[in-house]
Amino acid sequence: MHYRSRTYRIFSVFNIVFLLVLSAICIMPLIHILAVSFSAPAPANANLVRFWPVDFTVSAWEQTFGNQNFLRALWNGVFRTVLGTVISLATITLAAYALSKEDREFKGRKMYMYALVFVMLFNGGLIPTYILVQNLGLINTIWALVLPGAVNVFNLILLLNFFRTGVPKSLEEAAFIDGAGHFQILFKIYLPISLPALATVGLFTMVGQWNSWFDGLIYLTDSTKYPLSTFLQTIIVQNDFSQLNVNPDEVKALSERTVRSAQIFIGALPIIIVYPFLQKYFVKGIVLGSVKE
């Protein structure tokens, strides 16, 4: 057998070593910031911390979870991510189902596809988008964060290709013969079969919503409505500890680097927790949604 040959064994060993090195490169920064967050300010500021805490302390974590501003931003980030993911999945699913039909079933399908690809490559720009959001009365609301990017064309094309290649046409035709409508076919045939693609698109959307900070900085005038990513950007980039709501003595006792590390790790934690539950669908969704027979 070919998998018993020497060439195949060498190739397998190389793959395993390469993946182990790649995994270490991805994991080591997280371990480092976690170690810094549990270290005392002096060794952290002196760059003495590598992958294990020095002079272990939880002061940075106590300060992070002890102030209402951070907890409010954490809740805003979770709410924005959940709402944005649900809206995006709903709109993308409906659009992908319609666009997956043949030209004879959906007149003007090609025109819509060309328009979607065009706006994916050439968007309206920051200022026109801001003016549109302002005229719609969405400034300083959660809708300004989730509606402008609700239909991601890349995710739409991924799900569209899955609908066209992964759902047997015979099932759809049989359902039509039995008198089923489009919504029944979508919810009872397409969606159950398309769980891998939906999980993939949902993961992409979730990561994008959770990590997005620039739109919050533009559209939100009230800092109490900032999602966690925008909140962290304000503190980390501008070194603005006033939003931590601590007195000067506590600020002196803290290290900006330890607090920043704790907050960065917390910011990455939700996606790290969610990913293992979607992993079994992820690879299958990418493969089936990116090829066409």
Residue ranges and their predicted role:
Residues 1-293:
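A hydrophobic, multi-pass inner-membrane permease signature
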